[in-house]
A protein has these predicted regions:
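Core mixed alpha/beta domains of very large multi-subunit molecular machines
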Residues: 1-584
Length: 585
C-alpha cells in the first residue's frame, strides 16, 4: 500500500450543510470524508510559510467543503425523522417475523436512536434555520466558517476541543464541477491568496473574477514532479493563425427555428497553430518523462513536448550559433543557445491580467524556477489494442462492420482456446469483487486445474460477460490513446526567426487531398489512420490521417510512441475536432 503522504497531505472534506447545523446546535456531529491536499507548487509554498502538519501526513490548516444539500427547518427535520422511523418499524417487523435475534437487536437500537434524535430536535426546535445550498455557499464564502475538532480518549471521553476559523480560498476547475471549494485557516489566508494571485490587486468594479478564478488555482494543480526552468530562457512568441478555405456543412436554424444543415463552399476557417503547447529541450526534459510533460506555474499552463531545440538551432544557424539571437513578443532579445523552452502567448494567462513579463519572471524566481509537472504520456494497460466506444462504432458505415469487429472476434476465439491469453485477461481485469486472482492462483498451484469442470464453467461465464460488453460497443482495435502536438517543426522554424511567415516553410508535412498528414512512431510510415477525438461527440470528430515519417521529425523530436504530430497548416483538423487542445491542457 502506498502512503497518502507520498501524494499529498490528508485533509477533511466536509459536507457544508452538516457543518452549519452542527455549528448552530441542531446536530451532534458533522459529516466528513478523508480527502487529499495534493502535492503542488502551492503546497510547497505553504509548507515554507507556516502550514502546520501532523507527522508530515495530514493538516487542519486546509479543508474542502462540499455543498450538496441545504439545511433543514424544524418541520423538515421532523418529517425526515418520521420517515426514517417508519422504515425502522418495517425493519423491526420483518426481524420479528424471522425471529432473528441479531436483526431484532439492530432494529431496536435504530428505533431508540431515532427517539433520541426526535427528543433532541424538539429540545432545539428554535435553533433550526432553513437555508438552500446556494445560500449556504454565499454565507460561507462571505463570512468564512468555524470548524470544531474534538480529540477523545480511548474510552470516548473528550480530551480536547479546538476551533479553527477558515476563509474561502479558491475553487479549481475540477473542484467547481463537483461544487466543492478549498478553505484555509484565517492566519494563512493573506499569504496564500497573495501567492495564488501573484499579488494582483483586483479593481472594485468590473473585476475579471471568472478569469482569476480559473487561472489562479493553476499553481495549485496536483503534480507528479518538478522541473527547473529559468524564465529568461523561455522564448514566448505571439501565436500564429493560418486561414484557408474549404467546403463545410453549417448547422443553422431557419425562420421556423428548425435545425437545418447548410452546405457552404469555400468557407474560411482559422487554425491557431500552437495553442497551449510548448517545445522543451532535451537537456532539461526529465528522464522519466515520456514524450511530453504538462507544466504549471503562476497563471501559466502548457503541454511541453520533448525536442532537440539546441540541435536544431546549431544546424539552422551554423557558424553564427554562438551569437545568434531571436526577439520575443515583448521585444526582449534571447541568445538562441540559452533557449530551453519555446511557447506562445496562449499558454501564459498572466497577460490577460496585465502582468508584465518581468513581474512574472520575478514570481518564478521566488520558488527557484521550479515548474510543476502535472502528468506525462504513458502506455496503455491494454498494450497494443484499445477499446472503442459505442459512439465510435455508430459513426462508421455499416458496410465495413465486418472489418471493425474482426479483431474482437479473433480475440474472443483466443480467449476460448489459448490458456495464456485467458490468464492475461484475468490479470488485467482482476479486482476485489471478482475471483480472477483465485482462479490464477489455483492454476499456478495445479496446471491441470484448467481441465476441471469448475474452471471450464467459469471460463465460459467470463467470456460470455466479455462478449456482452463487446456487443455494447466495446470493440477492440489495434490502436492507442495518443497526445496531439500541432506542426512542431513549424514551431522550431518560427522560434529561429520570430517571423510568422517562417511557419510556411515547414516541409515535414504537406497538404494532401482527402486526408491530413501526421507523424507518430506508434504506427508505420505511410499507414492511413482513423483518428477519433476524445471525448468523441459525433462522426464529425472522425479524421482520416496519413502517417508520414521524415528525417527532420526523427532528428529533432523525441516523442516516443504516445505522441502524434499533426499538420495544422491548411487543414481542418482543429475545426473537425471541436477546437481540440494540444496535450489536454
Amino acid at each position: 500500500m502506498v502512503a497518502i503522504s507520498e501524494f499529498g497531505l490528508k485533509i477533511k472534506n466536509i459536507e457544508a450543510s452538516t457543518l452549519f447545523e452542527y455549528n448552530i446546535g441542531v446536530r451532534d456531529h458533522y459529516e466528513y470524508k478523508d480527502a487529499m491536499f495534493t502535492n503542488s507548487l502551492f503546497k510547497d509554498f505553504l509548507e515554507e510559510n507556516g502550514l502546520e502538519t501532523y507527522k508530515g501526513e495530514s493538516t487542519r490548516d486546509i479543508i474542502c467543503l462540499e455543498f450538496h444539500y441545504g439545511s433543514r427547518s424544524y418541520q423538515q427535520e421532523l418529517e425526515h425523522l418520521y420517515k426514517v422511523a417508519t422504515t425502522a418499524q418495517k425493519e423491526y417487523n420483518k426481524a420479528r417475523i424471522k425471529n432473528d435475534k441479531f436483526l431484532l437487536e439492530k432494529a431496536k437500537n435504530k428505533q431508540n436512536k431515532i427517539k433520541e434524535l426526535l427528543l433532541f430536535a424538539r429540545k432545539n426546535r428554535l435553533k433550526y434555520q432553513q437555508l438552500t445550498k446556494e445560500q449556504l455557499r454565499t454565507k460561507f464564502y462571505n463570512e468564512g466558517v468555524e470548524v470544531e475538532y474534538i480529540t477523545r480518549k480511548r474510552n470516548g471521553e473528550i480530551k480536547k476541543r479546538e476551533t479553527i476559523r477558515y476563509k474561502m480560498l479558491f475553487r479549481s476547475t475540477g473542484k467547481a464541477k463537483k461544487g466543492s471549494c478549498m478553505f484555509i485557516r484565517d492566519e494563512l489566508y493573506e499569504k496564500a491568496k497573495d501567492f495564488l494571485y501573484m499579488g494582483i490587486q483586483l479593481p472594485e468594479e468590473n473585476a475579471p473574477l471568472v478569469e482569476v478564478s480559473a487561472y489562479a488555482p493553476l499553481v495549485a494543480s496536483g503534480i507528479v514532479g518538478r522541473v527547473k526552468i529559468d524564465p529568461k530562457n523561455i522564448l514566448i512568441l505571439k501565436d500564429v493563425d493560418r486561414y484557408f478555405k474549404t467546403n463545410i456543412v453549417s448547422i443553422e436554424t431557419d425562420e421556423n427555428k428548425q435545425c437545418i444543415a447548410k452546405f457552404i463552399e469555400d468557407y474560411e476557417l482559422k487554425n491557431t497553430l500552437f495553442d497551449g503547447q510548448a517545445l522543451i529541450d532535451t537537456s532539461i526534459f526529465p528522464e522519466w518523462g515520456n514524450g511530453y510533460i504538462l507544466l504549471r506555474h503562476h497563471f501559466c499552463k502548457m503541454a511541453a513536448f520533448h525536442a532537440n531545440i539546441q540541435m536544431f538551432f546549431k544546424d539552422y544557424f551554423g557558424d553564427k550559433y554562438e551569437t545568434a539571437t531571436v526577439t520575443d513578443m515583448f521585444g526582449n532579445e534571447h541568445y538562441v543557445k540559452d533557449i530551453e523552452l519555446i511557447t506562445t502567448d496562449n499558454a501564459v494567462k498572466w497577460l490577460k491580467m496585465d502582468v508584465s513579463y518581468d513581474a512574472w519572471c520575478e514570481k518564478v524566481y521566488e520558488n527557484n524556477c521550479m515548474f510543476g509537472i502535472v502528468k506525462t504520456a504513458h502506455e496503455s494497460k491494454l498494450g497494443n489494442v484499445q477499446k472503442m466506444s459505442y459512439q465510435m462504432v455508430n459513426s462508421l458505415d455499416i458496410d465495413i462492420m465486418e472489418d471493425v469487429i474482426k479483431e474482437s472476434a479473433l480475440y474472443v476465439e483466443r480467449l476460448k482456446t489459448d490458456d495464456e491469453c485467458f490468464f492475461d485477461y484475468l490479470k488485467k481485469h482482476s479486482n476485489f469483487s471478482n475471483d480472477h486472482e483465485v482462479l490464477l492462483a489455483l492454476c499456478e498451484h495445479n496446471p491441470e486445474f484448467v481441465r476441471s469442470s469448475y474452471f471450464r464453467a467459469r471460463r465460459s461465464d467470463i467470456i460470455k460477460a466479455y462478449t456482452l460488453k463487446m456487443k455494447s460497443g466495446e470493440l477492440i482495435q489495434i490502436a492507442d490513446n495518443l497526445t496531439v502536438v500541432g506542426s512542431p517543426y513549424a514551431m522550431l522554424l518560427y522560434a529561429a526567426t520570430g517571423k510568422e511567415e517562417s511557419v510556411d516553410e515547414d516541409d515535414t508535412f504537406f497538404f494532401e487531398e482527402g486526408t491530413i498528414q501526421c507523424y507518430t512512431e506508434r504506427f508505420n510510415s505511410d499507414e492511413y489512420l482513423a483518428f477519433f477525438r476524445s471525448p468523441f461527440n459525433s462522426k464529425n470528430n472522425l479524421t482520416y490521417l496519413h502517417n508520414m515519417y521524415s528525417k527532420k521529425m526523427e532528428k529533432y523530436f523525441k516523442f516516443g510512441k504516445n505522441i502524434v504530430a499533426v499538420n495544422m497548416i491548411g487543414t481542418p483538423f482543429q475545426d473537425r475536432n471541436n477546437g481540440l487542445v494540444y496535450g489536454s491542457v
